[in-house]
């Protein structure tokens, strides 16, 4: 399994989608897993247009509960279900996330075939996802909101001193 980390912007638009831009959604591919940060309307369609599979999402982090940051979640979860997902899904957000996801999962008539766990985060709470940790940071907005700091854990690798010199990295004690 690859340890590569890749970020894919699925939506960067404002409060509502436009013909050329989707609303907030960013996928972070870490090895074979995908973390989703916000899930605005149309996120599942943006996944289909990208090279990233929404079936590989292991965790979703919602920054706040304005529609342009979470209204894509019900459709995404139902599409995962219809596509045969069995792997668990973790969803994190600010206080109120448990009630919101419970209400979301009651929409429509379908039986969820995979487990969904929900966690509410406060400032400085940390979620350990194996290769990375995600730390919540309280944001300033008109509603309670979080930003997220993603940190990759140290891993063994190969250092190429000649390439470092070419890039202008000054020699030092860890060179």
Which residues make up each language-model segment?
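Generic structural signal for residues in well-ordered beta-strands
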Residues: 7, 116-118, 134
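Structured loop/turn residues at beta-strand edges in well-structured enzyme cores
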Residues: 52-55, 114, 130-132
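Conserved beta-strand hairpin/beta-sheet module of binuclear metal-dependent hydrolase folds
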Residues: 2-52, 88, 148-150, 156-157
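Active-site neighborhood of divalent metal-dependent phosphoester bond hydrolases
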Residues: 85-120
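Active-site metal-binding motif and surrounding structural segment of the metallo-beta-lactamase
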Residues: 41-92, 120
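Alpha-helix N-cap/helix-start and coil->helix boundary motif
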Residues: 44, 54, 67, 97-98, ...
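Short glycine/serine/proline-enriched coil/turn segments at secondary-structure junctions
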Residues: 16-18, 110, 141-143
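Metal-dependent phosphodiesterase/nuclease catalytic metal-binding core
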Residues: 2, 121-175
